[in-house]
Amino acid sequence: MQLLTIVWTSLAAGIMATATPTSLPLCSMVDRPCKCPPGTTFKNLTTYGVIGAPARDVQDIMGSSAVFDLQFQGGLVPSSTKGKDNVPGAVRSFNFSGPAGYYVISEQVCLRLRMNSGHVADVYKLTKWKTSPDGSFNQQYQQSPKPPVVQVPGAGAYHGGWTSIVGQQTVVRNETAIAWKNWRCETGETFPSATSHEGGITNTSAVLEKQGKLTGVSIAAFTIFNEVRDD
C-alpha cells in the first residue's frame, strides 16, 4: 500500500508537470514542475521497488555509508576520495567510459541532516540527508556548482541533474519501499538511469540476503518515466 502511495504521488507530480514550459521555473533541487535550458530535453523518472528488510538495514546499504561504499551499485568503486565518508565536504570521483571516450564524474557531500521523526568533470553535491527513528531515509544530491555543461563523449551532455532516494519503512516490519527519482536536463542520452537504479535496488536486496537480513518479501524494481519533454 505504501509503495502504491509513493507511486501515485510521483505520477501526480508528473501530471502537474505538463504545464506550459515557458510558465515554469528553471529546474533545480526543488522537486516540482520545471523547465530546462532551450534546446535540451527534460527527463523525469522514478524507479520503485520493495526490499524485504527493515529500513534501518536498507539504510546501512543505500544511505548512511553510501558515499564511498557503493556495493549496492554493482560494486562501483571510486577512483579517488577526499574527506570522511558521508560528511560535508567529502568527495568521490569515478572514471567512466562513454561511447567515444572516458570522462570523470565527481560527487561531493554538501549537507547532512538528521530528523527525529575525453575527460570531463561532472560534480554532484549531496544537499539533503534525513533519517527517521524507524530507519526511513531521504538522500538528495545535485550536479554542482550551478549546473555546468558536461560532455559525455559520444553520448550527449548534462545541463543539470537532480536525484532523490527515499527509503520508507512500511507497516510490515521487514519491508522497505524505495523511490529513486531523477530529473535532469540533457542532450542525447547521458546515462541509463533506469537500468542503473533498478540494478541498485536489486543489488541491495542481494547484499542483504547474503547478510541474512532479507527476511521479508521483495518486489522487483521498475521504472516509470513521469515526463520526457523537449524544451
UniProtKB/Swiss-Prot annotation:
Acyltransferase as UniProt keyword: no
Keywords, in A-Z order: Glycoprotein, Signal
Disruption phenotype annotation: Abolishes the production of azasperpyranone A.
Glycosylation sites: 44, 95, 174, 203
Superkingdom of origin organism: Eukaryota
Induction (record text): Expression is induced by the azasperpyranone cluster A-specific transcription factor ATEG_03638 which is itself regulated by the azasperpyranone transcriptional regulator ATEG_07667.
Leader peptide range in chain numbering: 1-19
Annotated metabolic or biological route of this protein: Secondary metabolite biosynthesis
Biotechnology (record note): Azasperpyranones display potential anti-cancer activities. Azasperpyranones A, C, D, and F exhibit potent growth-inhibitory activity against the A549, HepG2, HCT-116, and HL-60 cell lines, with IC(50) values of 2.39-14.42 mm, respectively. Moreover, azasperpyranone D significantly inhibits HCT-116 xenograft tumor growth in BALB/c-nu mice. In addition, azasperpyranones A and C can bind with four kinds of therapeutic targets for cancer, eEF2K, FGFR, survivin, and TNF-a.
Role this protein plays: Part of the cluster A that mediates the biosynthesis of azasperpyranones, members of the azaphilone family that exhibit anti-cancer activities. Azasperpyranones are synthesized by 2 clusters, A and B. Cluster A is responsible for the production of the polyhydric phenol moiety while the azaphilonoid scaffold is produced by the cluster B. The non-reducing polyketide synthase ATEG_03629 produces 5-methyl orsellinic acid, which is then reduced to 5-methyl orsellinic aldehyde by the NRPS-like protein ATEG_03630.
Descriptive protein name: Azasperpyranone A biosynthesis cluster A protein ATEG_03636
Record organism: Aspergillus terreus (strain NIH 2624 / FGSC A1156)
